[in-house]
Amino acid sequence: MSNEETKMRLNRRQMLGTTAFMAAAGAVGAGGALTLSGGTATPARAQETSGSSYEVKPGELDEYYVFFSSGQSGEIRIVGAPSMREMMRIPVFNRCSATGWGQTNESRKVMTEGLLPETVEFLKDQGGLYLNGDLHHPHPSFTDGTYDGRYLYANDKSNSRVCRIRLDVMKCDKIIQLPNQHTVHGLRVQKYPKTGYVFCNGEDAVPVPNDGKTMGDKNSYQAIFTAVDGETMEVAWQVMVDGNLDNVDADYQGKYCFATCYNSEEGFTLADMMASEQDWVVIFNLKRIEEAVAKGDYKEIGGVPVLDGRKGSPYTRYVPVPNSPHGINTAPDGIHVVANGKLSPTVTVFDVRKFDDLFDDKIQARDTVVAEPELGLGPLHTAYDGKGNAYTTLFIDSQVCKWNIEDAKRAYAGEKVDPIRHKLDVHYQPGHNHTSMGQTKEADGKWLISLNKFSKDRYLNVGPLKPENDQLIDISGDEMVLVHDNPTFAEPHDATIVHASKINPVHVWNRDDPFFADAVAQAKADNIDLMVDSEVIRDGNKVRVYMTSAAPAFGLDDFTVKQGDEVTVYVTNIDEVEDLTHGFCIVNYGINMEVAPQATASVTFKASRPGVYWYYCTWFCHAMHMEMKGRMLVEAQGA
């Protein structure tokens, strides 16, 4: 075995030892108040420290927006940093009682118009909607290597979807379901020249097409990598690959993206998935893929172009790395990319400048690797400070490791130098971590957030289900300083820290906004001015109720419909004062929706229950809030 192979390969005994250690750590850590942290059990209070101030005084504003995923809760959460105050939740894949997301016509259109035809058929007897989502990996759009404030994209692992949030109004305006692909795990966006593509990893292989006819034929199973056009929210192209895909990132030159693979064995069981001592990173050549699509060198499957990127393809290269790599993260220097080992104590550092030669077959795959430092047990994700330092989460060690990229390269070249600068205990078992602006060329090296999977003893006991623990860390000095614990509900998988200067939301809606354009068009057809008129339009057994709302009164004190009518209520908030949001709730009908200033919202339902049903404003918008109400009168059939 060559020295190069010795550097790279994870000894089978080491791998099994690491795996056993991980299992033991999970068993101890999940059950008790103590956790594995550098090999010692540390009480929570022993870790309290006073670092740089994270205090944001009353009336002052945070320096950063932090966009958190929520995993199985299905929403985006907006937190301010460094205060770590939660400011807003954006419902996306979930049903939201507060805002009516998933019930209003506007939100249902977003949630359904991008579904695959077979999914629409599948959901016909289930209300027409998926009622769950597993939202991971929120990432904003880029222009020239930094955030441009237009959009935020995220994936739904549970139902193979991708969403887009408009950052001017902080609302989801597009959701699409990916054909051919089964699950979406890693998601990142094109950094240069702009977004551009949204890259989506297919984690699990299934037969393509997945119609139940070839389930026993392993050769029919394929994992799929997808590029979505971030402007049109349509699939631009897909690439079939060998092995499962995990996480993904892109370069700063607009030439390549790259994904980790943790199941090169293409196994169906845990033992099968861990059988090999090596997996790989897949590198995608965007120019070659685009040229092939333009020339028609693809198969159309599920209505989209699909290219064959399996081993030997001109579109991809496979670089061997130690077993089960997880995160892959591009450094702000535009040169280095780090794949994190997970089952190996190492991370693998690539130099993107070598990728051209790799695709031109001038060098071997492992020649793109320039460092492979050993950092600790369970490296999952790496963040950067823009000063040449990297910060890697060590899941099993419950630590964040600060290390220097150039020193790691020197050590890989044979020099006796230790790249590790500092290790900090975190609480407990960290997954993702992110630095302020650290995923852009403008990394500022101020803050790091460690998203920890277990909180254990850090908070008052709230029962068997515990919060996660997101910890704010000051990285402005030579050593990291833990300054704040922040509990979060299930379950953030990722976060992005964006300087507030990059985001510029509106305070009130623009009346020309496309979000409620369908309501405007219907009102025009009914000769209704939404900003003025409050009227009832009957069209057979379909009734359209239009009303304005201006605190503290709705435009209609009551309206009458017949039992069995299909009723659509349109409410337009004509208040122009910022933060004067109204709500519209019909008692005992299960109807509630948000109506923000200058917005129109609508909801459609069947008036199946006769009688008197009051509607009222659910937002406290006025001193006469309790009086802001009216009656829906439902005439009984035959009355």
From Swiss-Prot:
> Which amino acids does the record list as binding Cu cation A2?
617, 619, 621, 625
Q: Where is this region: COX2-like?
A: 541-639
Binding of Cu cation Z4: at which residues? 493
* Cofactor(s) listed: Ca(2+); Cu cation
A GO molecular function assigned to this protein is: nitrous-oxide reductase activity
Q: Can you tell me which residues bind Ca(2+) 1?
A: 453, 468
What are the UniProt keywords, alphabetically? Calcium, Copper, Metal-binding, Oxidoreductase, Periplasm, Plasmid, Signal
What's a Pfam family this protein contains?
A: nos_propeller_2
Residue sites binding Ca(2+) 2 per the record: 262, 265, 273, 279, 324
Q: What is its EC number?
A: 1.7.2.4
Instruction: State the free-text cofactor note.
Output: Binds 2 calcium ions per subunit.
Which residues does Cu cation Z1 bind? Answer: 326, 381
Q: Where does Cu cation A1 bind?
A: 582, 617, 621, 628
What post-translational events are described? Predicted to be exported by the Tat system. The position of the signal peptide cleavage has not been experimentally proven.
**Residues spanning the signal sequence:** 1-46
Reactions performed catalytically: N2 + 2 Fe(III)-[cytochrome c] + H2O = nitrous oxide + 2 Fe(II)-[cytochrome c] + 2 H(+)
In the record, biological process GO terms are:
denitrification pathway
Kindly list the GO CC terms recorded for this protein.
membrane; periplasmic space
In this chain, Cu cation Z3 is annotated as bound at 137, 432
List the HAMAP family hit by this protein, alphabetically: NosZ
According to its UniProt entry, what is the function of this protein? Nitrous-oxide reductase is part of a bacterial respiratory system which is activated under anaerobic conditions in the presence of nitrate or nitrous oxide.
Family, per the entry? Belongs to the NosZ family.
What does the record note on quaternary structure? Homodimer.
**The name this protein goes by in its record:** Nitrous-oxide reductase
Gene name of the encoded protein:
nosZ
